[in-house]
Each structure stands twice: as C-alpha cells, then as structure tokens.
Amino acid sequence: MATITREQIGSLHDKITVQMVKEDYVPGFEKAMKGYAKTVQVPGFRKGMVPAGMVKKMYGPSIFNEEIIRTASKELETYLQKENLAIFAQPLMMPNESNYQLDMNNPQDVSFSFEVGLKPTFDIKPIQDKAKLTRYSIEVADTMIADELVRLQRRYGKAEPQETVVNADDIIYATYHKCDATGAVVDANAKQEDTVLFDKLPKGMQTLLMGKKAEDTFTIVPNQVCGADELTAFLKDPLKTTETDAATTYQVTLTKVARLIPRDLDETLYAEVFPNAAITTLDAFKEKLKEELGKEFVRISKERLTNEMYELLVHQTKLDLPVAFLKRWMKEGQEKVRTDEEVEAEFGSFDHQLRWTLISDKLIVENKIQVNLDDVKNSLKAQVMSYFGMGADDEAPWMDGYMDKIMKDEKTIDETYRKMLFDRLFEYLETQFTIQDKKVSEEEFFKLQDPHATHHHH
C-alpha cells in the first residue's frame, strides 16, 4: 500500500509525496496489458490473437508509464478526500522530482511528489463590522424632462428633402474618398458614407458645409477642420481611420440634404413612445417620462451599490492565497501554456476574481442562498412576456412549447441561474451593511469616484 507524506513548502502551499512499492502498481499494469492484448489490432493477426510478447514489446513501455501515473494519482485523490483538503484547481507534479528509472522489465519502488494550493479559511470582516455604504437617489430634474421632450421630438421627427444646408437641424448625407498627394481620389470604390445631424459635425466642417447644395464636392484635411477635442472622433467615424490620416486630404461629396422636422407633442407621439399607456395630455406624458427616467436611475444606482459591495468585500476581506502555486498553475496547469510575462500581466485580474469567488461561495453556502429550476423558468417566462408586451392575464397557447424549447438551452439556463443567484446574494448583502440614503443630481452622481478606485488598497 502506498505511503503518503505531506510537508508545507509555503503559505497554503504543500508538497505531497506518494511513495509506492512495485506491488502497488505491477498488478494493475499486468491487468492493463491483458486487456489491451484482447483488443489490439496488428496487421497479420486476428483480433485478440497477437502474441503477448509482441504486445508487451510494442505497447508495454507506454502502458507501464500510464499505469504508474494512474496509480499514483488515484492514491493522491484518495488521500485528499480522506484528509478533506480543499485545494485550488488540481495538484501539479513537482518539477524534477522523479527519483526512479521506469523500466517495465525491472519494476522498482517509486515516488511522485505533487504540490497543492490550499484554500484559505477566513472571516468576512466588512459584514461583521456592518460597513457603511451609500445608496444614491438620483433626482429627475425638470430640465431633464425638457431635454427628453426635445430628444423625442427629434427622434420621432421626419426628414424633408432640402436644396441647401442652412441650419443646425439639417441632416447631412455625405461620402468621403481618400486622396493622394496631388488631390486625386485614390480609389473611387473605397468610400465611407455618413448620415449625421449638421450640429454633430466638427465646427470646421459646419463652416464649409453652410450654403452647400446636394452633389457639391469639396476637399478637407481632418486636422484642419477639427479642433483638438474633435479630431479623434471624426477620424474614427465617419472616416474609419486613425491619427495616421490626420493630415490626409479627403474629397467630400454632399449626396443629399434634408431638414429634421420635429414631431408635435400630441397624442399620436405619446402613443408611439408609450404604446401601452393611454396618455392624452402633455402633463401626463411628462409624468410618464419622469417615471421611466426614475426607473432607469434606480437601476443605475442599484448597479453602483452592487459594485460598491463587491469591491468592498474583495478589497477589505483579508484572505491569504498560495500565490506561487497559483502562478505556476496559470503557467502550466491549463490547456494554454503561458509565459512568465503573461502570468504576471494577468495575475492581478485573476487574483481579484478568485477572491470574489471564494467570498461569494462562502456567503452563498453559509446563508443558504438558492435558486431552483422553477425560479429560472419563471424568470425566463417573465422575460418572454415582457418582450412581447404581454400581461399576467394574457393567454398564449404557444407559451408552453416555447418555454420547453428555452429550457433545453443549457447556456441560457446556466446564465439565468447565475444571474438570479447573484441577484439574491446582493439583495441579502444589502441587509448586512449599514446603508445610508442620499439624494444627488445626475451630474453629482456621475462625478462620484469609481467603486474599484475607492476600495482598492492592496
């Protein structure tokens, strides 16, 4: 029977040695050889009739090696289960640790050494201390409602053809061709097309376009028509290029001009924006806009609070990790072998995510946070009904068949399950912190420091 010893070689980092006498693995090797001889196919021999000596000579060394490794791995697995060791990933064979020569004709006592990374035990101090967090309530200002009215009037407006570019509400349809040093078009077929509101163009382009008619052609140089704060965006879209073409000449053809005629604020617009709400007055429309903007702000605020809790737990929960083992596992223990430089570059984000996995797993288990298959199905059904604009009382004969099809999609089920599980985890966490409510304006909210930067101290 194998002898197993364990010694600490670092923080949460142990070396486990499996020592085997030949009697531990030779019977398994002989059994494997007999089984292989029954199935191996060699030209000139019937299946199962290949001489044992030939099979051993041809395939014995590889089967011998496999059986020794298999036996050692099985002994190690049994030991880990018996000792109830919680380890990261899987054991890694120690480099340059072999002290034997594998020879099937001369079996010897052998030993293998593995290194393992142990999962830490830890307390979640931010929860124990009822750490303080802020939940922000973003106010929907009257100016926001006014801006939203203008945006919707323009969005649902119509474009009327015009002869000449004359104001900021004009819609510009244009094509761009790159030119060579002489000003000639490089490739007539290589063009970029763009449709944009006049007032969204760089100021220099606006000056050139004013008064132009459809089919007019002129040339521009991006860094001459763009300010420093406009250049990068203009090169990216519409020109689909980079800073290397900042001084390149482009031929611009104004293919069409149209005028954006904003929609009137009336019942037809209200019905298009909110088809399921019977809105007849401007005041009611404004109230509905305020309600919808409020919902979006609640979502954004909740998302920030979730990020705050996540970052606080990751950065303020003290837990040790077997860094040396984890880096070696990242380098050698996966399908993709990484360089030392790649490991160092990726370790920060890996460490961050691993800490969250340990913390969230502990919280989910200890607080019995669960999601069952019916929960997943009901959530997906609600999403389907929302997508089709259905109410709870609406009948849909096709729904059962549609849901059966969705419930066979393992990826969708897994994604929904994980989202619901973590939603419930964060709902629970909201009850475990000291949360203060604070009203802020939209501008104040978006000036707040990023949660990661706030809590990142290690």
List where the protein language model places each region:
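Extended, charged alpha-helical "arm"/coiled-coil substrate-binding scaffolds
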Residues: A2-T71, T78-Y79, K178, G211, ...
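Core FKBP-type peptidyl-prolyl cis-trans isomerase
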Residues: A32, L149, E160-K212, V221-P222, ...
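Extended, domain-scale alpha-helical bundle/helix-rich regions
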Residues: F64, R70-F122
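Phosphate-interacting basic helix/loop segments used at nucleotide- and nucleic-acid interfaces
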Residues: I87-N99, L149-D169, D409
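Generic structural signal for buried aliphatic residues
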Residues: V110, I172, F218-I220, T248
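Internal alpha/beta scaffold segment
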Residues: G117-G157
